[in-house]
């Protein structure tokens, strides 16, 4: 019976490239010359830390980061910016990366599939949702339906089996 999995995964090497490209752009921009501006990725805790001298610069760096995410085809819904905090003369903003389906979001997705009226079977299996049906066309309808919905994080469809 045909099936596929719904997951939300981040490719950390692509995120790393986006952060590195943002760092290079910071070094070449005239308005950041002589300023204490940095951006760094912590892959273990899945956080990006922006440190600048003002709120405005922090917003500028975040905008540059979003731009590089778009260029690398990483969905910006994966970014969860926290409130910027002032510490000493620097403003620090932590951006958490959303990776994996949490149980609440998985339940919302499962409920949306059930309420859509499309006759498929879906079940939550850890950090993914398995969707099965007898016809491939029905599974493709589910994919189209889910692409139109907003769940606050990027969804990928993988492990498609006939």
UniProtKB/Swiss-Prot annotation:
Cellular component GO terms, alphabetical: cytosol
GO molecular function: nucleotide binding
Family annotation (SUPFAM superfamilies): YajQ-like
Keywords: Nucleotide-binding
Recorded superkingdom: Bacteria
Purpose of the protein: Nucleotide-binding protein.
Family: Belongs to the YajQ family.
HAMAP family assigned to the protein according to its UniProt record, in alphabetical order: YajQ (MF_00632)
The protein's name in its UniProt record: Nucleotide-binding protein ACIAD3137
Organism taxonomic ancestry: Bacteria, Pseudomonadati, Pseudomonadota, Gammaproteobacteria, Moraxellales
């Amino acid at each position: 019976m045909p099936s596929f999995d719904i997951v939300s995964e981040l490719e950390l090497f692509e995120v790393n490239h986006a952060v590195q490209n943002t760092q290079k752009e910071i070094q070449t921009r005239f308005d950041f010359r002589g300023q204490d501006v940095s951006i760094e990725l912590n892959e273990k805790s899945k956080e990006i830390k922006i440190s600048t001298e003002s709120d405005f610069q922090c917003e500028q760096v975040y905008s540059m980061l979003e731009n590089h995410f778009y260029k690398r085809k990483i969905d910006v819904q994966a970014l969860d910016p926290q409130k910027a905090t002032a510490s000493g003369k620097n403003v620090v903003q932590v951006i958490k990366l959303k990776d994996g389906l949490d149980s609440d979001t998985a339940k919302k997705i499962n409920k949306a599939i059930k309420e859509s009226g499309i006759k498929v079977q879906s079940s939550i299996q850890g950090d993914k949702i398995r969707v099965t049906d007898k016809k491939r066309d029905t599974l493709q309808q589910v994919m189209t339906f889910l692409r139109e919905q907003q769940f606050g994080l990027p969804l990928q469809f993988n492990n498609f089996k006939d």
